[in-house]
Amino acid sequence: MDCFRKNNVNCAGQLPTGFKPELLYQARNHPRALQLTVYAASDAINSLGIDWEAVRQLVPPDQIGVYAGSAMGQLDYNGFGGLLQARILGKKVTSKQMPLGYAEMPGDFVNAYLLGNLGTNGTNVAACATFLYNLRHAVRDIQSGTHRVAVVGTTEAPIFPESFDGFTTMNALADDDSLRKLDNLNVDQEPNYRRACRPFAENTGFTLGEAAQFVVLFDDELTLELGANILGGINEVFIAADGHKKSITSPGLGNYISMAKAVAATRNIVGEEALKQRSNVQSHGTGTPQNRTTESHILSQIAGTFGIEKWPVSAIKSYVGHTIATSAGDQLAATLGSFAHGILPGILTIDHIADDVSQDNLDFLMAHREIGAESIDAVSYTHL
């Protein structure tokens, strides 16, 4: 018997209408996340301004690493989703659904179809911090001298019914009824879905998004030898566990530790004055009631500890939603954009800060702030 019911969550951070990555190459029934991988990784490599063959001529094959994957795996019908649904739907399981569903498959695609890489390959699965874990592998490989080049990325395409069912059952997403209550709308009025994600304001849940983000890292010597365009530098990625917790999904003490280490490391490079006067935070900013209180408290405490007053805080998820594994990549991309253009993006989906948000030492940006590229010495961004 067919069953049809209306989903109470009707907003998501989707690819632009009409953009179909599967039409840009021979997709051959690839899951959507792998289609995004091919497009995003190709874009990153071709945006170097340097032919990849020129890079390969200078770097031994075993000194190139690729760290890419997803957190949830490929769960649509061409991946694990079809593997689990086929018999129920009266169809046959294909030979591709099992292997293409694995979480490490984005990295395998980059190696096999784009780079022909013979060097290190792998991914960490770490939920919303997956991009950061992969980035940490790359940074440490380059710092140790074992690698000179690293391609880092994550891909997530979680916009399908079963995923929404899971997150909705957790009360994690901004649903229509809750959005109507926030805006005092009648039952027959449609919420403003573009304002569904409201970090640090009165909010109700996050907005699920799909995305792929890839970056290419060189060591210093190779960067100068090739004359590469330098968008930024990564000195370290800090990760800490949360200790004992009552709920596995709640934040913990590890967030304070990792953020404090990141700020201290930034101060060691740019100096105390630059940290206090010319740094900002690209926050996790999911748009959930729990996040607005816990993350704001962390940032407020860290700012006070390091003598920072009115620390500017942005939240890129107010634009693109929460892309799970790729969310930290979204934050990094936004940060590099601020470096390049001297503009800190405001949180334009909000017009006030919630009463339970810690505001001491913080300046939540509710409008774009143009400060000039030369005025940004450091960015410490957090992912909780």
Model-derived regions: residue spans:
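Condensing-enzyme catalytic core mediating Claisen C-C bond formation in acyl metabolism
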Residues: S178-A274, S279-N280, L384
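Active-site-proximal gating segment of KS-fold condensing enzymes and close homologs
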Residues: D2-K6, R32, S70-T123, S163-F164, ...
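Residue-level detector of conserved catalytic or cofactor/ligand-binding positions
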Residues: V379, H383
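Conserved active-site "lid/cap" helical segment
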Residues: M1-A68, N134-H137, S258-Q277
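Conserved small-residue
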Residues: A41, V66, F131, A138, ...
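Acyl-CoA/ACP chain-elongation machinery
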Residues: T146-P199, N203-T204, V237-P251, G285-R292, ...
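ACP-dependent fatty acid/polyketide chain-elongation machinery
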Residues: M1-L23, E221-G233, A333-L348
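Active-site-proximal alpha-helical scaffold in enzymes
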Residues: L36-I50, A103, G107, N121-E156, ...
